[in-house]
Amino acid sequence: DLIGYVGSYPILGVPASLCAFAIGARMTNPRARILLEWSCVPGNAAERLASRGARIISNRDLPMKDTGLFESGEYGTCFLDDDGRMQPLASPVWLWDRVYEQVVRSVLSGSWTQKKEGEAINYYWGMDSGAIDIRLSDSVPAGVRQLAAILRQDMREGQLKPFTTVLRDQDGNVRND
């Protein structure tokens, strides 16, 4: 039930990604508890998470030197085997070509709306946009692969909306409207 998450630094989209990860983890395991370690502090984030009992460790960013994360070049979610080695399970895949294509098409068609200076534009496109997918390791069991395919398809079709739920903090306070 303990899942480790390595965040790069507590700014910008990192906390949002952590929260999204926690929501997804709890969809399949309501007892899931996410343990957080930052890679921006000295030491090995993966070892710290393992010492706290995490056997599943996730990281949304590319491997970073001296964090102990995914020396094989893998990133995403890994399983810590009995020998202490990271075994890849799944990885998010950002399909930037689809994002760029949609942006360029909207500019060329005249549908691009320019925002006021300093106003943020939302580039957090979900699976339904075709800009994000998931890659599963060959070691993932067939039943889990099947479940992942169902969830992927339902998110792409708008049938599953994991982020339209009431979000509560650790004290039970509602944090969204």
Please name every model-derived segment:
Residues 1-177:
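A residue-level marker of the well-folded mature domains of exported/periplasmic proteins
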